[in-house]
Amino acid sequence: MPALRTIQARYTLFLVLFIVLMLILTVVGISQLVAPKLRHTEEQVALNRIAEVAQRIQGELNKVQAQQRSITQTIPLLDSDSIDKVLPGLVDQYGEQKVFGGGIWPLPGQRTPGRNKHSTFWHRDASGKLVVNTFWNSDPAPNYYEQPWYLGGMQTAPGQCAWAAAYKDDASAEPRTNCAMAIRRDGQPWGVATIDVTLGFFNDLVARQEQ
């Protein structure tokens, strides 16, 4: 019996050691082979999601640029009164809420001879409705044609947006950017058109992607 117990003890010991060895090899195998592949897969999935969101964002910005091209080619065909009537429809885009507003900003004397500032700017109020804003035509307002966004827009190639750095003011709870694009009449500089875009739609795209 003692010999049998000794043999059983040895087998038990060998079995325990074998199990421990297999556990060690399994852990090492997972850490060395499986885990890196899992991390790579997770990283690739994350990168693919980021790329998809970036592509959608670029698509939304391209829509704004296409909208702006329509505006900058339409405005030179209109007289001053017609600009005020037509512009809200060009800006609104059937109530597209990411478009906070938009305007046209003629160079001094271009829209009305002898008039220094004669812009038309519409933006959304708290209910999402477009309302006209005449502040930039008032005497206390700085000259819009001297602002960085204006100068940047004047330098753009035909049909291309100059995107402003993100900013935030009291007019909206969300940060915004704007696309400024040059307007030319008869091949000569006439002014700049802007479309203000709220950046909140970035969050909406990310939220939909995470679902």
Name these PLM-found stretches.
Residues 95-159, 165-173:
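Extracellular/periplasmic ligand-sensing ectodomains of membrane signal-transduction proteins
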Residues 172-210:
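Conserved beta-strands of PAS-like sensory domains
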Residues 47, 65, 84-88, 147-150, ...:
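Extracytoplasmic/secreted envelope proteins and their assembly/folding machinery
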Residues 47, 51, 58-100, 104-108:
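Extracellular/periplasmic ligand-binding regions of membrane signal-transduction receptors
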Residues 2-36, 40, 44:
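Extreme N-terminal signal-anchor transmembrane helix of membrane signaling/transducer proteins, especially
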